[in-house]
């Protein structure tokens, strides 16, 4: 009997979480023509201030293995009017640039995920709201979770 009560309570909690996520998605408009809406719901953490989410935007392209490439472009944070929720918009990726090391012309090309150039784009970790990114349909959005070490060190004076 206790197991049945536990399972019932667990199902109820899952349904509430799912309903909340669905309610939150009502705030985010559908993507426009030629755009895709990416959605990430991160799991709850005990201390979410110790985490960040890195948004990684790019395309998979067939290239040589030796050079370093990147796209021009940016990620812009916007706020959904009337809701106050953040969303992120990626415009068209600019031209691809890269190093020009001499590579064997007969070397096979490989599929590589080429990202936006510049610093990593880190955003606040928040399990209560979905992370929503609007991007062109030919662009991929990936992510990485960063976690801070609980150890804090003293910095020297000088």
Spans of model-derived segments:
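Short, well-ordered beta-strand segments enriched in hydrophobic/aromatic residues
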Residues: 38-40, 133
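C-terminal partner/receptor-binding element of secreted or periplasmic proteins
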Residues: 124-158
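Bacterial N-terminal signal peptides that target proteins for export
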Residues: 1-7
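Sec/Tat signal peptide C-region and signal peptidase I cleavage site
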Residues: 17-21
């Amino acid at each position: 009997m206790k197991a049945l009560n536990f399972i019932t309570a667990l199902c109820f909690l899952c349904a509430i979480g799912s309903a909340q996520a669905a309610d939150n998605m009502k705030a985010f408009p559908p993507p426009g023509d030629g755009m895709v809406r990416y959605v990430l719901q991160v799991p709850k953490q005990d201390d979410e201030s110790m985490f960040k989410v890195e948004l990684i935007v790019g395309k998979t392209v067939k290239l040589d293995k030796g050079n370093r490439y990147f796209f021009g472009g940016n990620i812009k944070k916007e706020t959904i009017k009337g809701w106050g929720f953040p969303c992120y918009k990626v415009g068209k990726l600019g031209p691809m640039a890269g190093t020009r090391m001499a590579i064997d012309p007969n070397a096979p090309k490989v599929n590589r995920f080429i990202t936006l150039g510049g610093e990593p784009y880190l955003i606040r970790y928040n399990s209560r709201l979905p992370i929503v990114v609007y991007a062109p349909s030919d662009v991929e959005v990936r992510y990485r979770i960063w976690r801070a070490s609980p150890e804090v060190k003293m910095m020297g004076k000088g």
